[in-house]
Amino acid sequence: MITLLAVTRIFPTTSMGLTTRLLVPVACVLFLVGGRVQSQDAKFWNDQAKQTLQNALNRERTLNKNVAKNVVFFLGDGMGMSTVTAARIMKGQNMGNPGEETVLKWEEFPSVALSKTYSVDKQVGSSGSSATACFCGVKANDNMLGLDSRGRYGDCASSIGAAVDSFLILAHRAGKSTGFATTSRVTHATPAALYAHAPSRDWENDGDIPTEEAAKGCTDIGAQLVENGHVFDVVLGGGRRELTGTNQTDPEYPDEVGHRTDGRNIIEEWLSKKAANRTKYVWNLDAFSSVDPAETDALLGLFERGHMHFEADRADDEAGEPSIAEMTAKAIKILQKDPDGYFLVVEGLYNDGEGSDGMPYTTLNYADGPGGEIERDSYNAVGSRRNLTNVNTGGIDFKQSAIVPREDESHAGEDVAIYANGPMAHLFHGVHEQNYMAHVVRYAACLDYKEHCQMSSAPSRDGFNLWLILVTVFLSVRFWI
C-alpha cells in the first residue's frame, strides 16, 4: 500500500492530528517553556541513541523489496518544516512534556531523503506544477497541470502532444480501484493534476477559458473530470460551482448558482458514467454518513460550492461536511474491496499556515504571511515587535509573525523532507528531484518498470502497503507490510 500522509487531521488520534486553518495555531510555539517534566540525564539520551542505532542496524538486515499492492498518498499543501517542527512540539506539550523531544509518527520511518521543489521555469513552484511532478513523474512549467515543459501558461496550442498521465490513471489501467479526497475544490490545482491536462490551473470551468483559447480545442478542468476522471471510483471534496451551470441552483445555498456557461451539469455526467445502482452522490454530512461502503462501488461527494471549511470552522457549517479523516476512512472502505488493490490520494488544503525577551516570541517563523502586517504596524507605532505576553498564541485567530506582509502565507523554495517506510522505501536515499517520487511509486507498485515485478515476490493475500507523505514544501513517504 502506498500512502502519502498530509499533516492534517487524517488520523485524529495519532500524532498526525492537527487542526487545519489558514493561520494554524499549531505553528505557534512560545520561546518561554516551563520546567522539564521528565529526566533527561545521560541515561535518557544514551538509551534513546542506542535504540535509534539498533533500528538502523535492523533496517539494513530487512530491506523490503516486495511489491506494493495498495497506495495511499496524503498531501498537505504548503506545509513546511517549520510547521512540522511546531506540530512535534505542540504534540509533546499537549501530552504534558516540553515538546521538542517528541517524535511524530512519520519521523519513525526508517528512510529519509530530501526533495527539490522548483518548477521548470520558476524557483518556487506552484501547486499545479508541483502536483504534476509528484503525480505524473515529470517537471512542468509553473501553473501547468498534467503537461510536460512544452506546455506554456495560457497557451492552448502548446498543450497539444504535451500531456502526461498521473499514477492514479496508470493504476486504473492496471486494474486497481482509484480515487481521491481533498478539502479543496476537486478542480483545484493539486487534485486536478491527477486527471486534467491544462495550460492553466485557473481554467476550472468553461467560462474561465479565453474565447480564443477555447476555439483551439482546450477543455476546462471540470469537463475533464468527466472526460478523464470518470474512471475514478471515489471523488470527495468541494467545488460544486465549477461543475454546475449558471442556471442551476446550489442545494446548500439556494441564492447561489454554478459558474459554468455551457449549461452542462458535470455532476450528473460523472454519475451517468457509473453503474447507477451502486453509485452515490452526496453533498452534506448526513448523506455522507449514510453511505454504506459494502453497498457502494463509486462515490462522488461535493460538500461546498468552493473549498471545504477550515477544520476549526467545520462545525459552523449547517449542512455539515465530513472531516478529512472521515473522507479518508470512507474512501478506503470502498476501494479496499478490490482484490487487485487500490490507489488513493488525499490532500489537506490550508496547511500554508502559522507556525513567540521578557517579551515572548515564536521560535519558528515564516518569511511571509498575514502576521507581517501586524509586526509592521507594531514597529511603526511603538518601534518594536509586538509583545505576546498576554496574547493567546493558541487561539484560532492568532496570526503568526512574518517578515513580509501578505494576505496569506506562500510556498517556499527550499528542499522538503521525505520519510519512507515499506516496500522499496530504501529508494529514497539522498537529494531527489520532485518528479522522482512518482517513479518510486510506479516502481514499487509495478505500474511500469516490469522487471521489478518479475524479480520480486508477489504481493501477499493482504497486500504490501506503501505509505507516502507529501506536502508541497514537506514530503514524507511510508511503505509498510
Residue ranges with predicted function:
Residues 3-9, 19-36, 467-480:
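Cleavable N-terminal signal peptides of Sec/SRP-targeted secreted and luminal proteins
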Residues 17-57, 173:
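Short glycine- and acidic-rich boundary segments immediately preceding or forming the N-terminal edge
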Residues 40-54, 64-70, 79-136, 141, ...:
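A post-motif C-terminal structural segment
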Residues 146-161:
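His/Cys-centered metal/cofactor-coordination and adjacent catalytic loops
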Residues 163, 178-184, 450-455:
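Surface-exposed patches in mature extracellular/periplasmic domains of secreted proteins
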Residues 173, 178-181, 187-190:
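A conserved hydrophobic secondary-structure block that centers on an alpha-helix together
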Residues 453-467:
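C-terminal GPI-anchoring signal of eukaryotic secretory precursors
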